[in-house]
Amino acid sequence: MIKVGIVGGTGYTGVELLRILATHPEAEVICITSRSEAGMPVADMYPNLRGHYELEFSEPDASVLASCDLVFFATPHGVAMRMVPELMASGVRVVDLSADFRLKDLDTWANWYGMPHESADWAEKAVYGLPEVARDAIRDAQLVANPGCYPTAVQLGFLPLLEQGLVNPARLIADAKSGASGAGRQGKIGMLHGEIGESFKAYGASGHRHLPEIRQGLTAAAGKGVGVTFVPHLIPMIRGIEATLYAELDNPQDFDRLQALYEARYKDEPFVDVMPFGSHPETRSVRGANHCRMALHRQEDSNIVIVSSVIDNLVKGAAGQAVQNMNIMFSLDETMGLNAPALLP
């Protein structure tokens, strides 16, 4: 049984980790930390977990965390980079759901997150945890940087095109929409139901923190620099991401083989579903599930490839992918604890 700790358990990704791990046959959560809610029973904050956990939130205790086999960080940026080195020295393995170890260029990280990085050595050693790309490296990693939600949907949608060099890498567009849970659980006026209900807007159009992460992943896939325009949008639903992706095909005759290319690329990936050409994936088809569903489109004789990619931002975009990474790290069935279908309606 894997002894698991969770640092930062009061946000949406924290409770999603608890929900998934509650029925995981090979993992036991032995501690969950929150400075603000120390002493509160987990089930008092999250009534859906009544009967599943007797744990109380506790202050972070290095000795308790050091007794874990694996620790998940579901914290704001800047926390994990300060705590991880001590855990690494104790031999604990870590999956960090924050952005602290995702970027390899630490000047870029500091520019986007407004503080200097305090753990350069571990930032270099961390494995970027997109299983569909880095499964072997994840298996041996001590520290895994769990990908962001938008970057997961965008990278999975673009990967086959860039890996095969079929599109112009300088002209990529990602038009993405997310539910409100992507903004976290803190009380913000702009996220009140009365503010976002019956409304729809772009945000971060001049630059978003996930842009350098997307660019880093797509550059690796293409083997050369990429130019990507990424614009996120907030839509009035709780969870889910839809990313509509556009790329310019170098040879329009390649359209005829794109469906087969995508199906071949993802045929052995348990959590990627390539739908029939021309389908329209719905966010509700992945709600609560660790899946990415995608479909290809073409408008008349255009040389523009359109890919629609959907995920649940809290599952494949956060906690589910983190548990998937844990499974890989401990040589378990990758799908363990993650087989539940999406919730409908």
From Swiss-Prot:
Enzyme Commission number: 1.2.1.38
Subcellular compartments: Cytoplasm
Keywords from the UniProt entry: Amino-acid biosynthesis, Arginine biosynthesis, Cytoplasm, NADP, Oxidoreductase
Disulfide bonds: none
NCBIfam families: argC
Similarity remark: Belongs to the NAGSA dehydrogenase family. Type 1 subfamily.
Name of the protein: N-acetyl-gamma-glutamyl-phosphate reductase
